[in-house]
A protein has these predicted regions:
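Structured beta-strand-rich core segments of catalytic domains in phosphoester-bond hydrolases
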Residues: 1-35, 139
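The start of beta-strands in P-loop NTPase/AAA+ ATPase cores
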Residues: 35-37, 72
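Conserved catalytic scaffold of divalent metal-dependent phosphoesterases
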Residues: 27, 37-47
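Metal-dependent phosphoester-hydrolase catalytic domains
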Residues: 49, 63-73, 80-162
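Conserved hydrophobic/aromatic beta-strand scaffold that supports enzyme active sites
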Residues: 22-26, 40, 126-127, 155-157
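Short, solvent-exposed aromatic-acidic interface loops
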Residues: 1-6, 43-46, 140-148
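Active-site beta-loop-alpha substructure in enzyme catalytic cores
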Residues: 43-63
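Active-site flanking residues adjacent to catalytic metal/cofactor-binding acidic residues
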Residues: 41, 76-77
Length: 162
């Protein structure tokens, strides 16, 4: 769905510079047979209203699609930083979901945004979840894999159990 007033149509939302989407899938655990939903998003990097309303729309759509009883996960580039004005947009997620970074007993504090080394490193990428348990959260520094920057963001991962 598109992060806009018309999520079912190709569109640009609110004050966004770019068109943005959230993709989702319903998966079934091969071992236990239970289903869960995974959403991935990329909020706008310029529009404050687009970030705020995009986060609210994501929560609204997750509630509608996944419901209250099924485990649900969302990750992505939220273009928001805790402790900054943009961090306020993340409250839309934490009102209904838990932060994987905060909930995992093992968690690092490495920033996810590297800007290819040309700008200040900071955390802009997050994982939120509901009806699961986070075990380990990590930002994968690509230097350990022999390539300094594969993107302007490092991957973030979290191990969960249901």
């Amino acid at each position: 769905y598109w992060l806009s007033e018309t999520p079912g149509e190709v569109s640009r939302g609110w004050d966004a510079k770019n068109r943005r989407i959230t993709v989702w899938v319903c998966l079934r655990d091969k071992v236990f047979g239970g289903k869960f939903y995974y959403f991935n998003t990329h909020l706008d990097h310029k529009g404050h209203e687009a970030r705020r309303r995009g986060a609210l729309l994501n929560v609204e759509m997750m509630r509608k699609i996944a419901g209250k009883r099924t485990p649900v996960f969302i990750s992505g580039d939220m273009n928001a930083e805790i402790g900054q004005k943009t961090g306020e947009y993340l409250k839309a997620y934490t009102a209904w979901l838990e932060s994987a970074h905060d909930a995992a007993p093992e968690s690092d504090d490495r920033p996810s945004f590297n800007g290819f080394g040309k700008s200040r490193a900071r955390t802009l990428d997050y994982i939120y979840f509901r009806r699961a348990r986070a075990l380990r959260y990590e930002t994968l520094d690509s230097e350990a894999y022999g390539v300094r920057y594969v993107s302007d963001h490092y991957p973030i991962v979290c191990t969960f159990v249901f």
